[in-house]
């Protein structure tokens, strides 16, 4: 069975048992009345079952309801069908004040029907020939308005300065100021020029997201013809059907696939209604993607540390034990489905580097947009500052130093022999994003 943990807030007067049973029925075989065709099938075989209910600590009228769905209810290899069944209609139920899908346990038999990420963490490292450290990226800014040639120039400067990747912003598709084909050509030129100068393999996340699947595939095919290593997709706005199609193409044609989660906070930010991001992350690993944005813990975007590390493990590891202290409701066995690199991006700069290295470890992408392009000396010095800070943090960690306690000192020491890093440290020494997270663990 697929197991689901729902956070249920019933309307006043509705018992939790009735609410849990209604969720199980509506998301499987039930309807609002008895129908004569019920007698033509075995409802006992196909119906969802609410098998446990527990009150949420510290909340008045809120419960975690556990529902089991027989595997026969789901089409093999289809995240689209899985979500249509489990969350398709039930969230509009009048008997419920609010409903949130907190977690899913995907059984081994169902996991094996999915290709998953096009390549996974180890294959990506082998393709890039980069080991023993997080990868470094940068989102090109301003996100909208640059011509293709100026955009390509910014890509070149960042890659030449020491970054591994640069990135299209999620809303860069094919607008009047910069059509996709022009952008792809100038970015490919920038990649090859930077590779020739640095001797390192470089990449730019070329956003293939489009209004139709056919147009999306046309862009991915052109990227492959240019010989670039990676393309990008906005998987929630583009949809799981399009994403899975693109992931299959990427595996067949040797392209890495970067995934942006644009629109996720509409779905996952409210604590009592929607779908938790750990579910969207699991779904992405099944649908296919080699990177996905996962929050930063320390930057400008939502994300409590324990919760973030919980779904980071669900993205990367092969077997994850149930751990309610990190929001993981079920033990998950991925049976060697390739892992996904979490991408930390959003309001981060060089002073965050020790914390990011300590929190996310080597198998991650640390992505600095404003934290690269906002450097007072330009894009290439901004990239140099980030690369020096990262190398210093990795070296200090490997020497046994405590990044959590000594992080600022490590950055200061490195800045003494890197004027680019020293300038970055001065610019961003006062920048902090100290707001309470909306989505917190139940105490």
From Swiss-Prot:
Its main location: plastid. Keywords: Calvin cycle, Carbon dioxide fixation, Chloroplast, Disulfide bond, Lyase, Magnesium, Metal-binding, Monooxygenase, Oxidoreductase, Photorespiration, Photosynthesis, Plastid. Mg(2+) binds at residues 167, 169-170. The active site is at residues 141, 260. The keyword Repeat does not apply. Binds 1 Mg(2+) ion per subunit. Substrate binds at residues 89, 139, 143, 261, 293, 345. Pfam families: RuBisCO_large (PF00016), RuBisCO_large_N (PF02788). The modification N6-carboxylysine is found at residue 167. Gene3D superfamilies: Ribulose bisphosphate carboxylase, large subunit, C-terminal domain, RuBisCO large subunit, N-terminal domain. The record marks 300 as: Transition state stabilizer. One of its GO terms (molecular function) is ribulose-bisphosphate carboxylase activity. GO terms for cellular component: chloroplast. Its EC number is 4.1.1.39. The disulfide bond which can form in the large chain dimeric partners within the hexadecamer appears to be associated with oxidative stress and protein turnover. The basic functional RuBisCO is composed of a large chain homodimer in a 'head-to-tail' conformation. In form I RuBisCO this homodimer is arranged in a barrel-like tetramer with the small subunits forming a tetrameric 'cap' on each end of the 'barrel'. RuBisCO catalyzes two reactions: the carboxylation of D-ribulose 1,5-bisphosphate, the primary event in carbon dioxide fixation, as well as the oxidative fragmentation of the pentose substrate in the photorespiration process. Both reactions occur simultaneously and in competition at the same active site. Belongs to the RuBisCO large chain family. Type I subfamily. PANTHER family: RIBULOSE BISPHOSPHATE CARBOXYLASE, RIBULOSE BISPHOSPHATE CARBOXYLASE LARGE CHAIN. Heterohexadecamer of 8 large chains and 8 small chains; disulfide-linked. The disulfide link is formed within the large subunit homodimers. This is Ribulose bisphosphate carboxylase large chain. It comes from Villarsia calthifolia. The gene is rbcL.
């Amino acid at each position: 069975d697929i197991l689901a943990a729902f956070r249920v807030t019933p309307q006043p007067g509705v018992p939790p048992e009735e609410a849990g049973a209604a969720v199980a029925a509506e998301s499987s075989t039930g309807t609002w009345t008895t129908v004569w065709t019920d007698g033509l099938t075995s409802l006992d075989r196909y119906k969802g079952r609410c098998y446990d209910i527990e009150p949420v600590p510290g909340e008045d009228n809120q419960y975690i309801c556990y529902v089991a769905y027989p595997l026969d209810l789901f089409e093999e290899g289809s995240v689209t069908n899985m979500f249509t069944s489990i969350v398709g209609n039930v969230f509009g139920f009048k008997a419920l004040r609010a409903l949130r899908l907190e977690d899913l346990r995907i059984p081994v038999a169902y996991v094996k029907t999915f290709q998953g990420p096009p390549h996974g963490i180890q294959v990506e490292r082998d393709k890039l020939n980069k080991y023993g450290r997080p990868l470094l990226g940068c989102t090109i800014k301003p996100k909208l308005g640059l011509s293709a040639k100026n955009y390509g120039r910014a890509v070149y400067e960042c890659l030449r300065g020491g970054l591994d990747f640069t990135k299209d912003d999620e809303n860069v598709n094919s607008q009047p100021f910069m059509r996709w084909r022009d952008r792809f050509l100038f970015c490919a030129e920038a990649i090859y020029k930077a590779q020739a100068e640095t001797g390192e393999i470089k990449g730019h996340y070329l956003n293939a997201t489009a209004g139709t699947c056919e147009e999306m595939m046309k862009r991915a095919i052109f990227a492959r013809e240019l010989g670039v290593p990676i393309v990008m997709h906005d998987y929630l706005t583009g949809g799981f059907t399009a994403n899975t199609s693109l992931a299959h193409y990427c595996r067949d044609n040797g392209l890495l696939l970067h995934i942006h989660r644009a629109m996720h906070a509409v779905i996952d930010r409210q604590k009592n209604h929607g779908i938790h991001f750990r579910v969207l992350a699991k779904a992405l690993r099944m649908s296919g993607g080699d990177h996905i944005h996962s929050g930063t813990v320390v930057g400008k975007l939502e994300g409590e540390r324990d919760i973030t590390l919980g779904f980071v493990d669900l993205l990367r590891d092969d077997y994850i034990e149930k751990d309610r202290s990190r929001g993981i409701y079920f033990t998950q066995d991925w049976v060697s489905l390739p892992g996904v690199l979490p991408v930390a991006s959003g309001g981060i700069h060089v002073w965050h580097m020790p914390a990011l290295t300590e929190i996310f470890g080597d198998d991650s992408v640390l992505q600095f947009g404003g934290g690269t392009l906002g450097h007072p000396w330009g894009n290439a010095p901004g990239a140099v500052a980030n690369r020096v800070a990262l190398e210093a943090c990795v070296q200090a960690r490997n020497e046994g130093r405590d990044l959590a306690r000594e992080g600022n000192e490590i950055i200061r020491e490195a800045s003494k022999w890197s004027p680019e890093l020293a300038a970055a440290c001065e610019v961003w020494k006062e920048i902090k994003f100290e707001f309470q997270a909306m989505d917190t663990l139940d105490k």
